């Protein structure tokens, strides 16, 4: 295994342990097995893309993840802990790496899932091997829906939840919508969810395109949109694809003519567009300038900027929060037993933004507030792009309505 994949932790402490073991061997060889076991770190597997269109988001996800462990002094259960980070080259490759982390690296838990297609493949492996898995980015409905299993948890609200939150804003603009989404699980979820909402308000689909993931030239799509003259464009483009589209959208002079909207965007997607080109209304899970951030979130943002010399993107927070929640569950469980960790995750909760943040036990979906934001008319720096329009849900009753109930879910998993 490539040693660069393992975060070097407790180097000094481990050397001291090895020195102690050597001294003990001089006295009695019977001490050696005990010392070796004591020095063995707890390993956490991280599956995050190292290249491709999602890699910029993934960079922030992994930075937040490593920071979460550092804030625990790189320890879990009073033992040294380390993160083993592997790539997500494809859905199949991600599944193979998840299996390697479990079988060869002996990780006690998994974190990751940069894209929905990767997360769905990894989720199947986690369920098969009974390893707790916290998906920190993917939003496809199936993750905590039809493909759910008791060992997989998810941070991001599923696509239908975020789409429904956007409806009042979109309906006020008009009912003639054009769809431009990426041809994979996330984009397909966006298209199906918004089409259902549009049908419910008696609207019209005036165009519907699915672009291959990794597309760089969107000119043909933009020309079709311009000719169709929709009231707005529903986007479902991933990471670098979204960045490329918005740059070309501006170049074609469309940014001031037809509103653009998308859910579950990353700060980095828009930072890459540049402050003079960016436009739109979006949902995002967290924003570093949100005045309603909790004290813990504000402390995280400060710690991240101090360490990495840049503001914390939403993906940095998502990596940090997912890891922090998993690490808390391991410590709360008092062991690395997978079922004990799962139960600790399911029984955890905290108060934030007027709601009780928790995992619904029937599908392991995190219930947490998210934001509707729009791009500022005048952006004065390279990072602070958003006005926060609304935080959703506002209270626990609204959370139940937004995230749904077990009777309406496609998830039918057997509890551990």
Residue ranges, per PLM feature:
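Intrinsically disordered, low-complexity regions enriched in serine, threonine, proline
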Residues: 11-12, 34
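Extracytosolic ligand-binding ectodomains
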Residues: 2-6, 13-19, 38-416
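Sec/Tat signal peptide C-region and signal peptidase I cleavage site
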Residues: 32-38
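Hydrophobic membrane-targeting signal helices
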Residues: 26-32
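Cleavable N-terminal signal peptides
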Residues: 24-25, 36
């Amino acid at each position: 295994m490539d040693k660069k994949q393992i975060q070097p932790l407790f180097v000094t402490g481990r050397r001291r342990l090895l020195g102690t073991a050597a001294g003990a061997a001089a006295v009695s060889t019977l001490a050696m097995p005990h010392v070796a076991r004591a020095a063995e770190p707890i390993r956490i597997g991280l599956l995050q893309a190292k290249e491709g269109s999602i890699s910029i988001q993934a960079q922030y996800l992994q930075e937040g993840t490593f920071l979460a462990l550092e804030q625990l002094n790189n320890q879990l259960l009073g033992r040294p802990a380390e993160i083993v980070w592997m790539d997500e080259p494809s859905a199949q490759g991600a599944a193979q790496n998840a299996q390697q982390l479990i079988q060869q690296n002996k990780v006690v838990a998994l974190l990751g899932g940069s894209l929905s297609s990767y997360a769905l493949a990894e989720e199947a492996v986690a369920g098969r091997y009974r390893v707790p898995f916290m998906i920190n980015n993917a939003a496809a409905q199936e993750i905590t829906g039809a493909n759910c299993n008791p060992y997989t948890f998810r941070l991001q609200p599923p696509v239908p939840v975020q789409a429904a939150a956007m409806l009042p804003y979109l309906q006020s603009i008009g009912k003639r919508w054009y769809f431009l989404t990426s041809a994979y699980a996330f984009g397909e979820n966006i298209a199906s969810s918004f089409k259902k909402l549009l049908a419910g308000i008696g609207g019209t689909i005036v165009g519907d395109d699915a672009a291959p993931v990794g597309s760089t030239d969107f000119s043909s799509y933009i020309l079709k949109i311009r000719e169709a003259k929709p009231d707005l464009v529903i986007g479902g483009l991933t990471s670098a694809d979204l960045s490329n589209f918005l740059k070309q959208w501006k170049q074609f002079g469309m940014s001031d003519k037809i509103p653009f909207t998308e859910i579950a965007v990353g700060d980095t997607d828009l930072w890459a567009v540049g402050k003079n080109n960016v436009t739109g209304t979006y949902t995002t899970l967290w924003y570093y300038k949100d005045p309603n951030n909790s004290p813990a979130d504000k402390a995280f943002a400060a710690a991240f900027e101090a360490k990495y010399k840049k503001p914390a993107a939403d993906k940095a927070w998502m990596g940090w929060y997912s890891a922090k929640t998993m690490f808390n569950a391991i410590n709360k469980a008092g062991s690395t037993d997978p079922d004990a960790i799962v139960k600790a995750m399911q029984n955890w909760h905290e108060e934030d933004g007027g709601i009780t943040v928790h995992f619904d036990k029937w599908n392991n979906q995190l219930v947490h507030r998210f934001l509707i934001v729009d791009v500022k008319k005048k952006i004065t720096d390279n990072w602070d792009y958003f006005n926060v329009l609304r935080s959703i849900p506002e209270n626990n009753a609204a959370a139940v309505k937004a995230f749904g109930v077990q009777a309406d879910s496609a998830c039918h998993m057997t509890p551990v």
